[in-house]
Design a protein with these regions (language model features):
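Active-site neighborhoods and metal-handling regions in enzymes and metal-associated proteins
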Residues: 1-317
Length: 318
């Protein structure tokens, strides 16, 4: 595993275009995207430092020894001033880009040391590149989605067996592991009855009863790429009102998919689904965006919402 030169060159090109001479990447997913290495350092600092002049470093604690990465690795002790050590390798007097998750305790220390003339949130540089999926990435995501489909197919018959929502999540993990996934891509939402009205319900010890709608918001991770899906099923019987609403949502889904063509804007896709639900009298209950981008993380930069005027592309996966 080593630095992906093609991806690195695209990042460096974007840095030059935006006048950012030095970039600090701390997001583990973005570091993984560029280096093939995912490290969870907990509260400790890890930074992939990129310089348009080519002086790249990966700065990380000694507790996390790294293999050959195609970039020099700089280690610090837990008792060291890790930011000062990072700063010692940086050039002074330039605009510095940091990513959106770098903790203030590190950024403020870097500013105190007077390294840069300006500091900006430069997550967009890697985010924009990650948004464009290669053919290989698309294939990996198809495989993850197919596995997720199989997992959902095996989970649905269990909704009427008396398991609690939490137990259903455990059953789903067993299913994923048996199918060859690495695990959940996010904590699953299994919601029976009234709980299903909460888009981000925290699964609890509730059990289902005849007539309940059951929301299954589930996803797995396979070979480093995520799947995410939401399905609604019913236990035993379906009321006329529930059937009507289900069909409205399904038609809105179809209209959104039909609108998702290259050249359209993401807000057009959102509107295609939202306008139909509003037309049918349920617009006030559509409280969320239509979709979000996905890849190495289950929620990545980019979404299908009413304010996203970016153009749809075959290489953007939502």
């Amino acid at each position: 595993v080593t630095m992906d030169q093609n991806k690195l060159n695209r990042v460096l090109e974007s840095m030059k275009e935006t006048g950012i001479e030095q970039l600090l990447i701390s997001d583990p997913a973005s570091i993984n995207y560029l280096t093939g290495r995912y490290v969870n350092c907990m509260e400790r600092m890890q930074v992939l430092y990129l310089d348009v002049e080519g002086n790249h470093k990966f700065v990380i604690g000694k507790l996390f020894p790294q293999p050959e990465m195609g970039v020099e690795v700089i280690y610090f002790d837990d008792t060291e001033d890790c930011v000062a050590k990072l700063a010692s390798y940086m050039r002074k007097g330039t605009k510095i880009g940091v990513d959106k998750i770098w903790p203030a305790k590190f950024l403020l220390r870097l500013m105190e040391l007077g390294v840069g003339t300006e500091y900006i949130n430069a997550s967009f540089i890697v985010d924009n590149i990650r948004q464009i999926k290669s053919a290989e990435e698309q294939d990996l995501m198809r495989q993850a989605s197919k596995l997720n489909d199989l997992g959902c197919e095996k989970l649905i018959p269990l909704v009427s067996k008396g398991y609690t929502e939490l137990e259903m999540g455990d059953k789903l993990l067993e299913i994923y592991l048996e199918l060859g996934a690495e695990g959940h891509s996010f904590e699953p939402i299994i919601a029976y009855g009234d709980n299903a009205a909460d888009p981000h319900h925290e699964s609890d010890n509730s059990t289902g009863k005849v007539g309940d709608a059951v929301v299954l918001d589930i996803g797995c991770i396979k070979d480093g790429y995520c799947a995410d899906m939401t399905r609604t099923v019913f236990i035993g019987e379906v009321s006329d009102e529930a059937r009507k609403i289900y069909e409205i949502v399904l038609e809105a889904n179809r209209r959104g998919i039909a609108a998702a063509k290259p050249g359209a804007r993401y807000c057009d896709v959102d509107n295609a689904a939202r306008d139909y639900i509003t037309e049918m009298g349920y617009g006030e209950y559509f409280t969320h965006r239509t979709g979000h981008n996905i890849g190495m993380e289950v929620h990545e930069y980019g979404d299908v919402s009413g304010i996203n005027e970016n153009a749809v592309s075959y290489t953007h996966l939502t």
